Curated annotation (Swiss-Prot):
Top-rank lineage group of the source organism: Bacteria
Protein name stated in the entry: Endoribonuclease SymE
Organism: Escherichia coli O127:H6 (strain E2348/69 / EPEC)
Family note: Belongs to the SymE family.
GO biological process: RNA metabolic process
InterPro entries referenced in this protein's UniProt entry, alphabetically: SpoVT-AbrB_dom, Toxin_SymE-like, TypeI_TA_SymE
Keyword list, A-Z: Cytoplasm, DNA-binding, Endonuclease, Hydrolase, Nuclease, RNA-binding
Amino acid sequence: MTDTHSIAQPFEAEVSPANNRQLTVSYASRYPDYSRIPAITLKGQWLETAGFATGTAVDVKVMEGCIVLTAQPPAAEESELMQSLRQVCKLSARKQKQVQEFIGVISSKTPR
């Protein structure tokens, strides 16, 4: 007798046959010896429909006989203050000290 948890339930596949693509591994030439290296090119409007718009960061997982591409969510935009802080970090130590002193002056509660 089978357990109720071992009975297969019908389900719809996440990927329909209409969404399958057939590709062939081609090659690209590598300079300076022009050796051939394997290459796969993906292009088409279906990429954007699948969540891979131009500029999307992609995570690539490689296994034997399998490559999985996952679109990464867009990074949250930095606030204007954080962008300014990153700019200050690139300044010289003397200028960073001046910025710190300026912040100290404008944040002090004592009137002048």
